[in-house]
């Protein structure tokens, strides 16, 4: 038979309007859903601090600092035998899917994921990376284990599509979006995500205005929240408005920034930079014909390949790191300014540059954090 399971990983810190919306949806649909409301202290990346690269929602060791009380219907670590303290939130998602598949003795398990390729390069790559097993050759599917799949039915929806559908069908929605609109936040920047990750850092200061009670509790929850809330959307860490101090090149400014960091943090950035430089020299990143022409127009030395391992019409381009480049597709081009932005945003994983965590990096991070836990 068929069964509908609703899984929500509760990250403890959220706008009260978001929590109200989730509660409303769950209550309205309890007759058709088997609800798993998960409150587990897995590790979650944070970009608010140079010293704390992750935090744990619902960490029993910091119960006195919790931003809110745990929901009464919460499922805690004792319900999930696969959980361990080294686990990241995305690791938990995968292991939960496997566990549920076995618990239900299912023939096949499908996990619907609401990501859209428009949201970020990493989400675009989830769909189009071309090196994955699929369900019946549907490109918006990924096999994560035998007979266990992730499906991304909204992968090609634009932000405007969501609101057109909402207006047409009269769906309930998170009223936080109304406040975002009234605050002048553009549609494509209205994110309802964990407030400490890089994608949400620019809107972090809105907590002070929209949900001051939650903001007051957040200050003591994760290191660096106050700074990120003040400067996350200004020259100090802004992506578009960052300015180079007088007398520096972007490379020398990057070297200065690295010199101010703790050794283990600095080494992680240097490892990412080394990998990126080698990648662009030896393999090359894929760029559109339009971007390639912009590089040619600026007399930037490049080597263009014929094909790529990715399923894309873009061409692989090998090139050296630039100091800076003033084009709309700035994020796609390797530059020391791009690296500076990662450092200023406390983007420990260099997600802004298109990096994703590897298992080896997770292990290195675990070892480093264990070694330096007395100062974190």
What does each model-found stretch correspond to?
Residues 1-376:
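Nucleotide-activated chemistry modules centered on ATP-dependent adenylation/adenylyltransferase
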């Amino acid at each position: 038979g068929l069964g509908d399971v609703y899984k929500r990983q509760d990250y403890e810190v959220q706008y009260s309007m978001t929590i109200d919306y989730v509660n409303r949806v769950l209550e309205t649909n309890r007759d058709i859903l088997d609800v798993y409301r998960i409150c587990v202290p897995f590790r979650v990346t944070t970009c608010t601090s140079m010293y704390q690269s992750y935090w744990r929602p619902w960490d029993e060791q910091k119960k006195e600092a919790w931003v809110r009380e745990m929901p009464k219907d919460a499922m805690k670590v004792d319900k999930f035998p696969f959980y361990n303290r080294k686990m990241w939130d995305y690791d938990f998602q995968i292991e939960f899917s496997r566990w549920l598949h076995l618990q239900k003795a299912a023939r096949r398990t499908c996990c619907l994921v609401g990501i859209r390729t428009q949201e970020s390069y990493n989400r675009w790559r989830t769909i189009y990376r071309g090196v994955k097993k699929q369900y019946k050759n549907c490109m918006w599917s990924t096999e994560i284990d035998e007979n266990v799949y992730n499906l991304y039915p909204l992968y090609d929806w634009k932000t405007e599509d969501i609101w057109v559908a909402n207006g047409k069908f009269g769906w309930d929605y998170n009223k936080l979006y109304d406040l975002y609109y009234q605050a002048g936040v553009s549609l494509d920047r209205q994110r309802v995500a964990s407030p400490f990750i890089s994608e949400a850092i620019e809107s972090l200061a809105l907590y002070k205005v929209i949900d001051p009670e939650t903001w007051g509790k957040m200050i003591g929850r994760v290191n660096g929240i106050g700074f990120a809330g003040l400067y996350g959307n200004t020259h100090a860490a802004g992506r578009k408005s960052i300015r180079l101090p007088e007398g520096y090149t972007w490379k020398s400014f990057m070297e200065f920034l690295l010199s101010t960091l703790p050794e283990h943090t600095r080494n992680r950035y240097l490892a990412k930079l080394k990998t990126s430089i080698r990648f662009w020299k030896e393999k090359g990143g894929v760029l559109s014909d339009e971007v390639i022409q912009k590089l040619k127009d600026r007399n930037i030395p490049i080597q263009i390949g014929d094909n790529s391992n990715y399923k894309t019409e873009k061409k692989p381009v090998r090139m050296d790191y630039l100091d800076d480049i003033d084009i709309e597709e700035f994020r796609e081009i390797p530059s020391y300014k791009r690296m500076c932005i990662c450092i200023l945003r406390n983007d420990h994983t260099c997600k802004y540059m298109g990096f994703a965590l590897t298992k080896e990096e997770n292990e290195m991070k675990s070892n480093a954090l264990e070694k330096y836990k007395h100062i974190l």
